[in-house]
Amino acid sequence: MAEKRNIFLVGPMGAGKSTIGRHLAQQLHMEFLDSDTVIEERTGADIAWVFDVEGEEGFRKREEGVINDLTQEQGIVLATGGGSVISKESRNRLSARGVVVYLETTIEKQLARTQRDKKRPLLQTDEPREVLEALAKERNALYEEVSDYVVRTDDQSAKVVANQIIQMLEER
């Protein structure tokens, strides 16, 4: 793992990127960063506000800049936003600057994990399942393209998934 010290987590909303990322960082004594949190810190507003005011395109532009900045750090675990892989530049930076782990999960698990979360602007709809299915259709191939590893998170605790990732990296 020496040549690629950073660990970047990609996957859909509700896959567990932030929770698993915190466990990974703690166990590996690395810094944990969340691109959505950094966007909120830099704008002084939450993601939903950025979406409302700047639209998805404005948000994606901000996200691309944050991904560029954060992937230049050393020794980090980065939880990316679910749509970060839409940008080819972001995919290239993630691939070049760290080990990319795709956290895969089912639509059912995504719904269960996100149903009470009001901070997900794309899910503020009467048909969240349809939105998640459309996003999966658009993004799953991009997650696979950019990833070095794929890990299912459906019925496992964040700690178990973090341990699986550590084991994969050690076997590398």
From Swiss-Prot:
<keyword id="KW-0547">Nucleotide-binding</keyword>
<keyword id="KW-0460">Magnesium</keyword>
<comment type="similarity">
    <text>Belongs to the shikimate kinase family.</text>
</comment>
<dbReference type="InterPro" id="IPR000623">
    <property type="entry name" value="Shikimate_kinase/TSH1"/>
</dbReference>
<keyword id="KW-0067">ATP-binding</keyword>
<dbReference type="GO" id="GO:0008652">
    <property type="term" value="P:amino acid biosynthetic process"/>
</dbReference>
<comment type="pathway">
    <text>Metabolic intermediate biosynthesis; chorismate biosynthesis; chorismate from D-erythrose 4-phosphate and phosphoenolpyruvate: step 5/7.</text>
</comment>
<comment type="function">
    <text>Catalyzes the specific phosphorylation of the 3-hydroxyl group of shikimic acid using ATP as a cosubstrate.</text>
</comment>
<keyword id="KW-0479">Metal-binding</keyword>
<dbReference type="GO" id="GO:0005524">
    <property type="term" value="F:ATP binding"/>
</dbReference>
<feature type="binding site">
    <location>
        <position position="156"/>
    </location>
    <ligand>
        <name>ATP</name>
    </ligand>
</feature>
<keyword id="KW-0418">Kinase</keyword>
<dbReference type="GO" id="GO:0004765">
    <property type="term" value="F:shikimate kinase activity"/>
</dbReference>
<feature type="binding site">
    <location>
        <begin position="14"/>
        <end position="19"/>
    </location>
    <ligand>
        <name>ATP</name>
    </ligand>
</feature>
<dbReference type="GO" id="GO:0005829">
    <property type="term" value="C:cytosol"/>
</dbReference>
<feature type="binding site">
    <location>
        <position position="36"/>
    </location>
    <ligand>
        <name>substrate</name>
    </ligand>
</feature>
<dbReference type="GO" id="GO:0009073">
    <property type="term" value="P:aromatic amino acid family biosynthetic process"/>
</dbReference>
<keyword id="KW-0808">Transferase</keyword>
<dbReference type="GO" id="GO:0009423">
    <property type="term" value="P:chorismate biosynthetic process"/>
</dbReference>
<dbReference type="InterPro" id="IPR023000">
    <property type="entry name" value="Shikimate_kinase_CS"/>
</dbReference>
<protein>
    <recommendedName>
        <fullName>Shikimate kinase</fullName>
        <ecNumber>2.7.1.71</ecNumber>
    </recommendedName>
</protein>
<keyword id="KW-0028">Amino-acid biosynthesis</keyword>
<feature type="binding site">
    <location>
        <position position="120"/>
    </location>
    <ligand>
        <name>ATP</name>
    </ligand>
</feature>
<feature type="binding site">
    <location>
        <position position="18"/>
    </location>
    <ligand>
        <name>Mg(2+)</name>
    </ligand>
</feature>
<comment type="subunit">
    <text>Monomer.</text>
</comment>
<keyword id="KW-0057">Aromatic amino acid biosynthesis</keyword>
<dbReference type="InterPro" id="IPR031322">
    <property type="entry name" value="Shikimate/glucono_kinase"/>
</dbReference>
<dbReference type="GO" id="GO:0000287">
    <property type="term" value="F:magnesium ion binding"/>
</dbReference>
<keyword id="KW-0963">Cytoplasm</keyword>
<dbReference type="InterPro" id="IPR027417">
    <property type="entry name" value="P-loop_NTPase"/>
</dbReference>
<dbReference type="Pfam" id="PF01202">
    <property type="entry name" value="SKI"/>
</dbReference>
<feature type="binding site">
    <location>
        <position position="139"/>
    </location>
    <ligand>
        <name>substrate</name>
    </ligand>
</feature>
<feature type="binding site">
    <location>
        <position position="60"/>
    </location>
    <ligand>
        <name>substrate</name>
    </ligand>
</feature>
<feature type="binding site">
    <location>
        <position position="82"/>
    </location>
    <ligand>
        <name>substrate</name>
    </ligand>
</feature>
